[in-house]
Amino acid sequence: DLGRSLKQLAQQQGVTLFMLLLASFQTLLHRYSGQPEIRVGVPIANRTRVETERLIGFFVNTQVLKADFDLETRFDALLQQVKRTALEAQAHQDLPFEQLVEALQPQRSLSHSPLFQVMYNHQNAGQGKALELPGLRVEALERASATAQFDLTLDTYESGDALSASL
């Protein structure tokens, strides 16, 4: 099974499945675009403060994770680069995306996001899987979006050994 094999590879390389899939996606983007720097937006739960842990609400922040490629970049080295980048980004997950944009002052355009045009979202639960709580049943609803926020969005869903994706 592909999901199990990818998890085993991630474990052998000392990375998470998220990191392995992100590195693979960034490699694909690099191969198609030829760009030596690939930046991908990644949503993060942003619930590091004790006072928000028990609140119901949308506290998601966006991080920008960059991978650098050259002619000699091996995939195992890229995995370690992505691991370092992801772990270092965790230390700054409380920095609001808007403040990051203000500090970096990139060239702005109404046609695209200022720091990245590709989003990657990995979820550790089954897609559409119902959640049961005492006296409460929660179920994910499919939401059709008529507009695209980014040029490309990859969503991956991990449930047990199963792995699914949508682009």
Regions found by a protein language model. Give the residues of each.
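Adenylate-forming
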Residues: 1-167
